[in-house]
Swiss-Prot record:
It is found in: Cytoplasm. Acetyl-CoA binds at residues 377, 383-384, 402, 420, 437. InterPro entries: Bifunctional_GlmU, GlmU-like, GlmU_C_LbH, Hexapep, Hexapep_transf_CS, MobA-like_NTP_Trfase, Nucleotide-diphossugar_trans, Trimer_LpxA-like_sf. The gene is glmU. UDP-N-acetyl-alpha-D-glucosamine binds at residues 8-11, 22, 73, 78-79, 100-102, 137, 151, 166, 224, 330, 348, 363, 374. Catalyzes the last two sequential reactions in the de novo biosynthetic pathway for UDP-N-acetylglucosamine (UDP-GlcNAc). The C-terminal domain catalyzes the transfer of acetyl group from acetyl coenzyme A to glucosamine-1-phosphate (GlcN-1-P) to produce N-acetylglucosamine-1-phosphate (GlcNAc-1-P), which is converted into UDP-GlcNAc by the transfer of uridine 5-monophosphate (from uridine 5-triphosphate), a reaction catalyzed by the N-terminal domain. PANTHER family: BIFUNCTIONAL PROTEIN GLMU, NUCLEOTIDYL TRANSFERASE. Pathway: Nucleotide-sugar biosynthesis; UDP-N-acetyl-alpha-D-glucosamine biosynthesis; N-acetyl-alpha-D-glucosamine 1-phosphate from alpha-D-glucosamine 6-phosphate (route II): step 2/2; Nucleotide-sugar biosynthesis; UDP-N-acetyl-alpha-D-glucosamine biosynthesis; UDP-N-acetyl-alpha-D-glucosamine from N-acetyl-alpha-D-glucosamine 1-phosphate: step 1/1; Bacterial outer membrane biogenesis; LPS lipid A biosynthesis. Its cofactor is Mg(2+). It holds the Pfam family Hexapep. The lineage of its organism: Bacteria, Pseudomonadati, Pseudomonadota, Gammaproteobacteria, Vibrionales. It comes from Photobacterium profundum (strain SS9). PROSITE patterns: HEXAPEP_TRANSFERASES. This is Bifunctional protein GlmU.
Amino acid sequence: MSFSAVILAAGKGTRMYSNVPKVLHTLAGKPMAKHVIDTCSDLGASHIHLVYGHGGDTMQQVLADEPVSWILQAEQLGTGHAVNQASSGLADNEKVLILYGDVPLISGDTLTNLLDAQPDGGIALLTVVLDNPVGYGRIVRRNGPVVAIVEQKDASEEQKLIKEINTGVMVANGGDLKRWLGQLKNENSQGEYYLTDIIAIAHDEGRAVEAVHPVNPIEVEGVNNRIQLARLERAYQAMQAERLLEQGVMLRDPSRFDLRGKLQCGTDVEIDVNVIIEGNVSIGNNVLIGTGCVLKDCEIDDNSVIRPYSVIEGATVGEDCTVGPFTRLRPGAELVGDSHVGNFVEMKKSRLGRGSKANHLTYLGDADIGDRVNIGAGTITCNYDGVNKFKTEIGDDVFVGSDTQLIAPVKIGKGATIGAGATINRDIGEGELVITRAPARTIKGWKRPVKQK
């Protein structure tokens, strides 16, 4: 179906007590407005118009890559006025979906139902029934059909008893919407142009108004303060955790798991508590993720174990690998397979070959390490001279002793052995043994100092 979307995002968000525009506050690591934009894009919106006001420069910087038309609402004169700012860009013969940048959990399924439910020439609007509707506009029906929406401040005592409320989300044809917007008046307690008044205008024209309920009521909850944002964050994470559990992923405690991107898992994946997933993460079969790990834009292949408190970003972990605890794999790190990096090891733009291991206290940067290599504790690839980065190449079956500095650019040939405490600043041939430390000396008769009285 062809439709365009208008997203209202001009509010200041006073109750957030922040210099950040309200719709840029993040939920699951993504600005609230982007959640709504992505949902519209996934549904195939032909155009997305974003109506902004406060913090416009910041919004355009943060959302610079989004497929939206920017519509300025210089004065905040109500929701009807906000939509009217975008009217010149709305096609007469296209459905127009009106959404809100601070209602981030609205789903594609709910919006599809709403678009499908729109009567010919009429309006479809999203409503919910609340036990406590205080503060919301009430849905006024007459013998069944919706005839009007009355805002809380303008409602009579009888109307305040109504429990069906307006969410603000609606769809109408572009031509009709523009005509109705032109008839709005600001004769109300707020002195604003209410978008909701078009319901009564449409009814007076004999147009049908259809009310639709969301798939899940949490979808239409908005955010005005940090308490509400935190509540939606937990609701979102609970939904993501439930989906993963249904797919066979074992989350040891679903309430202590955060998904801030997309996660693809194989079978028999186990994720311990307080794990954070960001960006696009792919996990193979029979993988264990330990407590406190952070995974971002990475791939972990079958039968690998990520031990607690490891951080993996932009890296690839091959099959049958062990990582951690307390390992950091930075962008460009690759463990080929059956390899091991242990506690306090950091890798960046480096490849660790099959069967190789760096078990302790090591930095590997811009390094290409072959198969079956042992990297001793305290080894550092010195890849940076203050201006440029240089590469370290280590062949297969090399043994690097503890506390070794490899000053790049440098090559270590296959089967070479480097003794502990070495500083290597030249290439080492295949099979060579290199020892750079001075011989140990013994001082006979030496005595420790005695504290003077």
